[in-house]
C-alpha cells in the first residue's frame, strides 16, 4: 500500500470514527433529556445522568480531535492529487 492509498484508507476510517462519536453524542443527549423529564426524582438515575454528561463532553472532545486529524489527512490528499 502506498502513501496515497494509506491516506485514503485513513480518511475513511476517520469519517467512520466521527460518525460513531456523533451517534453516541446524540444518544447521550437524548438519554440525559429523558432522565431529566422522567426520572428526576430517582437518585440512581441522576447519578447515571451525571456520568452521561461527563461521557458526552468527553465524546465531543474526542470527536473534535478526530475531525482535526481527518481534515489534516484530507489536506494531504488534496496536495497529493493536485497536478
Question: Can you say where each PLM-predicted feature lies in the sequence?
Answer:
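Long amphipathic alpha-helical coiled-coil segments
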Residues: 63-83
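Extended alpha-helical coiled-coil "stalk/arm" regions
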Residues: 18-49
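Short, charge/polar-rich alpha-helical segments
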Residues: 1-26
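Surface-exposed polar/charged interaction patches
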Residues: 13, 17, 34, 38-41, ...
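Acidic, low-complexity, intrinsically disordered interaction modules
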Residues: 38-64, 70
